[in-house]
A protein has these predicted regions:
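Conserved donor-binding/catalytic core segment of Leloir-type glycosyltransferases
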Residues: 4, 190-217, 227
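Membrane-proximal helix-turn-helix segments that form the acceptor-binding/catalytic region
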Residues: 79-82, 105, 129-146
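A short, active-site helix/loop in glycosyltransferases that binds the activated sugar's phosphate group
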Residues: 140-167, 174-176
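Acidic anion/phosphate-binding donor-loop and adjacent secondary structure
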Residues: 158-159, 173-189, 362
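Nucleotide-activated donor-binding/catalytic signature segment of Leloir-type glycosyltransferases, i.e.
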Residues: 239-260
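Aromatic "clamp/platform" in nucleotide-sugar-dependent glycosyltransferases that forms part
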Residues: 277
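Short hydrophobic beta-strand element within catalytic cores of glycosyltransferases
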Residues: 290, 294-297
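Conserved acidic donor-binding segment of nucleotide-sugar-dependent glycosyltransferases
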Residues: 312-319, 327-331
Length: 362
C-alpha cells in the first residue's frame, strides 16, 4: 500500500509539533511493510536525503511565506501524490486540509489528522484565521477518515460539523526517554544539574514564553536559571522582542536543539514549564513527562486533558500565580514524579493508524 503524506514541513529534525509527530509515526508505519512517502518543504530541509528510516522523501520548492506556504505546498504535494499513484493521501493540520476536496476530485482516498484549531493562534490575522477555519471545515466534511489527537478536538468537530462517523481519537505519542549527561554542553550554557527551569517550544506568541520570563524575573530564584530551548520559523517582531527580553533578564537561549543536547536538558532540569494559550496535544509536555520531571502548565483544555494533578496547573496568563508555582518548585527538594504514559506509545499509535489505512483501502 502506497501512503503519501503532506501537511508537514518535513522530517527529520524540523522544528514543530506536527513535524515531531510525523517523524515518530511514519518510520514505524514504513517498518511494517508500507510504502510511505513524505512530501517536504525544501526551504526547511538541507540534508538532501531521499530516504530516511524507510520513509521516502520528496522535496518541493515552496515560498517561505507564513500565509501562503502551506496551501501552495499542499497543492503541489497532492499533484505529486497523484503522479506517484498514492493509495491513500494523509494530510496533516487544518491549513493544508483546505485542499482535501481537490484531492477527492482527483479520485484520492484521504485521511486527515486534525492537530488543533490553529485559528486560535495569536500570530494569525483575520484573513488567515478565516482560511484556517475553512480548512478545518473542508477536512472534516470531505476526508474519508479524520484522526483527532485529543478528546477536546473530537468534541469540537462533533459540535461544529456534526462529524461523528469515521472519526478516530489517536493521541500524540512520546518516545522512550534517553537519559544522559552532557557536562561539556552544560559548561557551555553555564548551568548546573537540577538548577534550571526549562521551557521548550517554538518562539511564537501563543506559547506565552514572555509570561514565563516575566514570572521568573519576579521571583527569588536562589541561583536557579531559566533555559529556553527552541526558536522560530519566521523571525518577526515578537520573536526578536522575546529574545531581547530574555537576554536582558539573563535567560539562556539554546536555539533549536535535538538529540543529546535536548536529552541532557530534560534529564537534569528542575522543572518543565509550558504556559501556552493554545495547544493541540503538546508533544513537548509529553516528552518532559517521559523524563519523570515536575511540570507546570497552563490550564487550557488541551493541557487539562493530559490529566495531571491540580497543583501543577495555573490559570493561563496569570503571571502572579505562575511566579508562585515557580517559587514552590525552587524551594521544594527535587522530585521525579511518575506519570502514566501508556496511551502515548508510538508503536500502539502506529498500529491504530495502520488499521485506518487498511479499512479505507478495502
Amino acid at each position: 500500500m502506497k501512503i503519501v503524506v503532506t501537511g508537514t514541513r518535513g522530517i527529520p529534525n524540523v522544528m514543530g509539533g506536527v513535524e515531531t509527530h510525523c517523524e515518530e509515526l511514519f518510520p514505524r508505519i514504513a517498518a511494517k511493510g508500507f510504502n510511505v512517502t513524505v512530501i517536504r518543504r525544501k526551504s526547511y530541509v538541507h540534508d538532501k536525503l531521499k530516504e530516511w528510516k524507510g520513509v521516502k522523501l520528496v522535496d518541493i520548492e515552496t515560498p517561505k511565506k507564513k500565509a501562503l506556504e502551506a496551501i501552495i505546498h499542499t497543492f503541489k504535494a497532492i499533484n505529486v501524490a497523484k503522479k506517484l499513484g498514492a493509495d491513500i493521501l494523509h494530510i496533516h493540520a487544518i491549513g493544508p486540509a483546505l485542499l482535501v476536496p481537490y484531492a477527492k476530485i482527483l479520485g484520492m482516498k484521504v485521511v486527515f489528522t486534525h492537530h488543533g484549531p490553529d485559528y486560535d493562534r495569536d500570530k494569525w490575522g483575520i484573513m488567515a484565521k478565516t482560511i484556517l477555519k475553512l480548512g478545518e471545515r473542508m477536512g472534516c466534511m470531505f476526508a474519508d477518515d479524520v484522526i483527532v489527537i485529543s478528546d477536546v478536538i473530537r468534541n469540537l468537530i462533533k459540535n461544529k460539523y456534526n462529524r461523528i462517523n469515521r472519526v478516530h481519537l489517536i493521541y500524540n505519542g512520546v518516545s522512550k526517554p534517553e537519559f544522559c549527561d552532557y557536562p561539556e554542553y552544560f559548561n557551555e550554557l553555564g548551568i548546573e544539574k537540577g538548577k534550571y527551569i526549562l521551557g521548550m517550544c517554538r518562539f511564537v506568541p501563543e506559547k506565552n514564553l514572555h509570561h514565563l520570563i516575566e514570572a521568573f524575573s519576579k521571583i527569588d530564584n536562589q541561583g536557579c536559571k531559566l533555559v529556553l530551548a527552541g526558536d522560530t520559523d519566521f523571525e518577526d517582531d515578537y520573536s526578536r522582542r522575546l529574545k531581547e527580553t530574555a537576554r536582558k533578564h539573563g535567560v539562556i537561549l539554546t536555539g533549536f536543539i535535538k538529540g543529546k543536547k535536548l536529552h541532557s536538558l530534560l534529564t537534569n532540569c528542575r522543572c518543565y514549564c509550558l504556559p501556552s494559550s493554545h495547544e493541540g496535544l503538546p508533544i513537548a509536555l509529553l516528552e518532559a513527562m517521559s523524563y519523570n520531571i515536575p511540570v507546570i502548565v497552563s490550564d487550557i483544555p488541551a493541557n487539562m486533558e493530559v490529566g495531571l494533578s491540580k497543583d501543577v496547573y495555573f490559570h493561563v496568563g496569570n503571571i502572579k500565580e505562575l511566579s508562585e508555582k515557580l517559587t514552590t518548585i525552587i524551594n521544594t527538594p527535587l522530585t521525579h514524579p511518575s506519570y502514566n504514559m501508556e496511551k502515548y506509545d508510538w508503536d500502539r499509535i502506529s498500529n491504530e493508524v495502520i488499521d485506518i489505512y487498511k479499512k479505507l483501502s478495502q
